[in-house]
Amino acid sequence: MMGRDYALYFFAALGSFLVVYIVLPIVTIFAKQALDFEMLVKTVHDPLVLEALRNSLLTATATALISLFFGVPLGYILARKDFRGKNFVQAIIDVPVVIPHSVVGIMLLVTFSNAILDSYKGIIAAMLFVSAPFAINSARDGFLAVDEKLEHVARTLGASRIRTFFSISLPMALPSIASGGIMAWARSMSEVGAILIVAYYPKTAQILVMEYFNNYGLRASRPISVMLMLISLSIFVFLRWLIGRVRE
């Protein structure tokens, strides 16, 4: 028993390295910005910054909704049907995870050219490519967790497949689907590389941070980073808390 306890302490010590590694930069940037509050106030009143934040929030939200609209049906098919090429389809879904995001931007630009160049469509297209796997995989996992016998009973009692989907499958898988939507939104909010190539304009907050850093240095880019983190983390934590309450 004692050996197992020591092993747990050892694993906790090893794992805590990553926790500290993640938390330390977050705490540090907030602490240093608090010492330069005047710059933060100036940035909060910068119309360009506010517009960039609005662009990021709107496009990320639109991307998450589009990911769910197309990803939920695909997730249901992957969870419920075996078909030739299914493993290939699942592999394709995960491809965006391994492609460098600057390459994603080049691919989209080569494919769609001026149709998405420097536009909201381009921003959403870039975000969608990198975030869709989260929505699809979460939906698939959610439907896999639903007992298929419940669907069969409903079908036996005369319910159509579409009615069974909306009355049984979808409500029971909803927490997982919502989690996927949140992750798709968060991934969209953090995207830079693909957007940089496809749609430098209209500027998102992610691009503006990079631009301010290149042109004006760390002090100018830090408050925008803090604002973007505050907004993103607040929304992310709230949505995760909401999903947790629904699961309870």
From Swiss-Prot:
Tell me a GO biological process for this protein. transmembrane transport
PROSITE patterns documented for this protein = ABC_TM1
Its lineage opens with:
Archaea, Methanobacteriati, Methanobacteriota, Thermococci, Thermococcales
Which UniProt keywords are present, listed alphabetically? Cell membrane, Membrane, Molybdenum, Transmembrane, Transmembrane helix, Transport
Organism per entry: Pyrococcus horikoshii (strain ATCC 700860 / DSM 12428 / JCM 9974 / NBRC 100139 / OT-3)
Give the principal location in a single coarse category. Answer: membrane
Q: State what protein this is by name.
A: Molybdate/tungstate transport system permease protein WtpB
Residues that span the membrane, as ranges: 10-30, 57-77, 92-112, 116-136, 165-185, 224-244
Residue limits of the ABC transmembrane type-1 domain? 53-239
Q: Which residues lie on this side of the membrane: Cytoplasmic?
A: 1-9, 78-91, 137-164, 245-248
